Swiss-Prot record:
Keywords per UniProt: Glycosyltransferase, Metal-binding, Queuosine biosynthesis, Transferase, tRNA processing, Zinc
Protein name: Queuine tRNA-ribosyltransferase
Active site per database record: 92, 265
Quaternary structure note: Homodimer. Within each dimer, one monomer is responsible for RNA recognition and catalysis, while the other monomer binds to the replacement base PreQ1.
UniProt GO molecular function: metal ion binding; tRNA-guanosine(34) queuine transglycosylase activity
Length: 367
């Protein structure tokens, strides 16, 4: 019996306003989860994440299992005890990271054998091992182990990949056993609607606490992503959280909420921050550009983050040019605050019954 509770508070069209409740805290949805691959959101402390409004973060099963390993994390009680984040944590299963290894992996019915990117040793990961690792981490939301279907994939390749993921989903559910953490199933099927339908039907039959759409934002054209979202999102169970994995840009989030998605994660705001790409209410600023050398205005006059309240574009340009660590930190604080503020604005618009209007205005003004 899971300790997670999901309340669907309000709907506007397909867009949903909800709340996910855990013993460690509530998550207002639609929600964006900052990514802490190795247990930390790069350059930020848990206090800073809370200040910007984050209510859940994502950790990476694959990387934490390889380093530092679950024995060390278990000595701290859980990943929460290890990294000082006392709110909910979602961990992905490791499937996407294994997919990212490409030819360095060997896939069988049992699982995946690959060369460790840490020390080049031979490593085996299966649904059962992934579930045990996530249990050891004390994750609040556990993702079932799947194979992320690559893009492009023929219909035959996508079908075989999806069917393997569904067999692994069943094994994940069995291995999850009496773990009170929530277990989410992942819909696969590539760019083929009928395969997505088959996948969702199978996952409903196995019965999960939440449902995720995987295998998007893997290199496909934007129109294909929207097509699959349009087809799939609203068919996911109404009474359970819906999670779109690894997506995306601010526009992607607004468009996915419009289609019925509740939860998101993406490395984009933090990774782009380190490369000097800043999200603002009017679009992206490339702070490396010489035109900001003597610009004394803040990044975004509509933003209340620490960076915007205290520093100018000129100073941030200087930090970027001199490769100061502080530049990455200040950019990351701003970008992740921008994402959290976007989700707050979406939730407020849904609360007030004007999300459709908000979407039109946002898509028109955001370049």
């Amino acid at each position: 019996m899971t300790v997670m509770k999901f309340d669907l508070i309000k709907k506007e069209g397909k867009a949903r306003r909800g709340k996910i409740t855990f013993p460690r805290g509530d998550i207002q949805t639609p929600a964006f989860m900052p990514v802490g691959t190795y247990g930390a959101v790069k350059s930020l402390s848990p206090v800073e994440l809370k200040e910007m409004g984050a209510e859940i973060i994502l950790g990476n099963t694959f990387h934490l299992w390889l380093r530092p390993g679950t024995e060390i994390i278990k000595k701290h009680g859980s990943l929460h005890g290890f990294n000082g984040w006392d709110k909910p944590i979602l961990t992905d299963s490791g499937g996407f990271q294994v997919f990212s290894l490409g030819k360095m992996r060997k896939l069988t019915e049992e699982g995946v054998t690959f060369k460790s990117p840490v020390n080049s040793s031979k490593v085996f990961l299966s649904p059962e091992i992934s579930m045990q690792v996530q249990r050891d981490l004390g994750s609040d939301i556990v993702m079932c182990f799947d194979e992320c279907t690559p893009y492009p994939a023929t219909e035959k390749e996508a079908k075989e990949s999806m069917e393997l993921s569904m067999r692994w989903a069943k094994r994940s559910k069995e291995a999850h056993g009496d773990n009170p953490s929530a277990l989410f199933g992942i819909i696969q099927g590539g760019m083929y609607e009928h395969l997505r339908d088959e996948s969702l039907a199978k996952l409903k039959e196995i019965d999960f606490d939440g449902f995720a759409i995987g295998g998007l934002s893997v290199g496909e054209p934007k129109e294909d992503m929207i097509r699959i979202l349009d087809h799939t999102a609203h068919q996911m169970p109404e009474d359970k959280p819906r999670y779109l994995m690894g997506v995306g840009t601010p526009k992607d989030l607004v468009e996915a909420v419009y289609r019925g998605v509740d939860m998101f994660d993406c490395v984009m705001p933090s990774r782009n921050a380190r490369n000097g790409h800043i999200f603002t209410s009017e679009g992206v600023i490339k702070i490396r550009n010489s035109k900001y050398k003597d610009d004394t205005s803040p990044l975004d006059p509509n933003c209340d983050c620490y960076t915007c309240k205290n520093f100018t574009k000129s100073y941030l340009h200087h930090l970027d040019k001199t490769k100061e660590i502080l530049g990455s930190r200040l950019n990351t604080i701003h970008n992740l605050t921008f994402y959290q503020n976007l989700m707050k604005s979406i939730r407020k618009a849904l609360d007030e019954g004007r999300f459709s209007e908000f979407r039109k205005e946002f898509l028109a003004s955001y370049k």
